[in-house]
Regions:
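Glycine-rich beta-strand-centered segment in the early N-terminal region that forms part
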Residues: 21-38, 48-90
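NAD(P)H dinucleotide-binding glycine-rich loop of Rossmann-like/cofactor-binding domains
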Residues: 45, 85-147
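Short glycine-centered segments of the SAM/dcSAM-binding site in methyltransferase folds
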Residues: 82, 140, 164, 230-231, ...
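Hydrophobic/small residue at the entry helix of a nucleotide-binding pocket
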Residues: 150
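Adenosine-nucleotide cofactor-binding segment
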Residues: 159-218, 269-272
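Glycine-rich phosphate-binding loop and adjacent beta-alpha segment
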Residues: 169-172, 217-288, 322
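C-terminal hydrophobic helical "lid"/dimerization subdomain
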Residues: 270-322
């Protein structure tokens, strides 16, 4: 099979397009023929070595596909079932083996591309607004990178709840996308200081929660924008990881809450995974959640796909097709 293998950590150039043997499922695993694989910042973190992984490995951990073979102990699926998953490395390939307990069924009304696009980013947006900080009607959320893959979904989910959304984006094109997703106020951070603008919009009051997937370049200003006992949810590090931080600073700023959550801890059990996936896919089927799939790349172009994502040149979701 064709696959994208990493033999050493580094830049996009270490993404090698290679021939590998088709993996064989263990007793509790399923062999999935990949239809589409999602491209995410976490793939870059693994490639760079921010998240250590034994080498070599096949990058990517989000995909949709069709069951091709079953391990001897798997009874919950059959060959030909349409499935999707996230959280298991190996998606940048024609085939991948996935533990049966990590797979979700894809409803008939959801396309392969939609399923691949919804797993990691859709469930991330879902746990952020429902669990990391259970957003309520009438509250105000500041959402960074609001035209990105997670950002556009966060805006839509926050508005579905009835919250007020202040969004930050880098360009006017991205501002239009954020407004189209429902953002009440949009700040172009390259032209305006987002801290100054947010304080103006809020009449000097703090927001209830900040959803920040940017990291290093926004963190310090975020701390100045929360109400007393407000929440800063740092769920990503697109600009780099946040430097070591003195927790004592949270008290004088209003007894703030700070967390660095990961999706994997919010889909740790099969029951929670199935419930969260069903909610997200159900919102898509009902038309409440619109996915923006900006670009689809052939598998061999994984290097360019990750360059485009890291360069903040993209909006919405990027996919690889084996």
């Amino acid at each position: 099979m064709k696959a994208i293998q990493i033999e050493k950590n580094g830049g996009p150039e270490v993404l090698n397009f290679v021939d590998l043997a088709v993996p064989q499922p263990k007793p509790n695993e399923v062999l999935v023929k990949i239809s589409a694989a999602g491209i995410n910042f976490i793939d870059i973190y693994f490639r760079e070595g921010m998240y250590p992984r034994a080498l070599p490995f096949v990058d990517g951990q989000e995909a949709s596909g069709v069951v091709s073979a079953l391990g001897s102990e798997v009874t919950s699926f059959k060959v030909g079932d349409r499935v999707a998953y996230t959280g298991v490395l190996g998606a940048y390939a024609e085939f991948a083996v996935v533990p049966a307990g990590r797979l979700v069924r894809v409803p008939q009304g959801i396309t392969d591309h939609q399923a691949a696009a919804a797993m990691l980013q859709g469930m991330t947006a879902h746990y952020l607004v429902h669990d990391a900080f259970p957003l309520q009607k009438g509250q105000t959320a500041l959402i960074h990178a609001a035209a990105g893959g997670v950002g556009l979904l966060l805006v839509q989910m926050a508005k579905d709840i009835g919250a007020r959304v202040i969004a930050t984006v880098g360009t006017e094109e991205k501002a239009k996308l954020a407004r189209g997703a429902g953002a009440d106020e949009v700040i172009l951070y390259k032209e305006q200081d987002f801290e100054v603008e947010t304080k103006r919009i809020m009449d000097g009051k703090g927001v209830d929660v900040i959803y920040d997937g940017v990291g290093k370049t926004t963190f310090e200003q975020d701390l100045n924008l929360l109400r007393p006992r407000g929440y800063l949810i740092c769920f990503g590090a697109a600009s780099g990881p946040v430097p070591p931080f003195d927790l004592q600073r949270l008290a004088p700023k209003g007894s703030l809450f700070l967390t660095r959550p990961s999706l994997m801890h919010y889909i740790a059990s099969s029951e929670e995974l199935q419930r969260r996936a069903a909610d997200v896919l159900g919102m898509i089927e009902a038309g409440k959640l619109k996915l923006r799939i900006e670009h689809v790349y052939p598998l061999k172009d994984a290097q360019q796909a990750q360059r485009d994502l890291a360069g903040r040149k993209t909006t919405g979701k990027l996919l690889l097709i084996p």
